[in-house]
Amino acid sequence: MSDPAPEIEAPVEAAPVASPPKGKKEKAPKAPKSPKAEKPKSDKPKKPKVAPTHPPVSEMVVNAVTTLKERGGSSLIAIKKFVAAQYKVDVEKLVPFIKKFLKSSVAKGTLLQAKGKGASGSFKLPPAAKKVEKKPKKVPSTPKPKTTKPKRVTGEKKVVKKPAAKKPEAKKATKAAKPATKKVVAKPASKKAAAPKPKAAKPAAKKPEAKKATKAAAKKPVAKPVAKKPAAKPAKKPAAKKAK
C-alpha cells in the first residue's frame, strides 16, 4: 500500500486593518496654558462721595404734610412746592422718588390718601401718628432718684435731737422723788396715832350688845293687837239701833 499524500495547507490571508471612522479626527494633546499676565491696576483716584445737601425724601415729604396741615390732604404739587422752597433742591429730579415714597407709605399706613389713586391725589397723616409724636415730649421730665438722699440726712438730725430732750426727764424724776420722801415721813406718824385705838376698842365692843338689848326691848312693847283698836267700831253700830 502506498502512503497517503501530505495535505498542503492553504496560505492564511491577513485580516484587513480597520480604517478610522470618517469625520472623527484624533485630537492632539493640548499644550499647558501659560499663566496670563496680570493687568496692571490703574492708579486712578476714586471720586469721593458727595454728601447730600438735603435730608432723605421720606423726611421731606412727611415734613411737608405736617407743616401744610390741610384738612383735605396735601397734593403732590403742594408737596413739590414746599420741598423746593424749604430745602432748595431740584424737585424734578426727586419726583420719581417722591411718588415711590407716597405709594409705599400709603401701603404701610404711615400716610393716608384722602383723594385720588397712586401718587396722584392728596395725602395726610393718620390720627394715630399725631399721638405718637406728642408722647416722646413728655418722657424726659422724670428725674426721681435725687429725692432719696436728702431723706436720710433729715433722719440723722432727728436722732441728734433726742438725747438733748432727756435732760428735762431727769428734772422730773428729782421732783417726783421729793414728794415721795414726804409721804414716807407722814406714814409713821399715822401709825403712832392709830396705836392707842385698838386698846379702847375692847370696851367699845360691849356697847353694841347694850344697843341690841335696847332694840329688842323697844320691839317688845310694840304690840300688834293695839293697832287693832279700830275693831271697836262694829260695837257702836248695835248701840245706834237701840236708840231707835
From Swiss-Prot:
Residues 35-45 have a biased composition (Basic and acidic residues). Residues 1-59, 113-244 are annotated as: Disordered. It is found in: Nucleus; Chromosome. Keywords: Chromosome, DNA-binding, Nucleus. One of its GO terms (molecular function) is structural constituent of chromatin. Histones H1 are necessary for the condensation of nucleosome chains into higher-order structures. Belongs to the histone H1/H5 family. This is Histone H1, orphon.
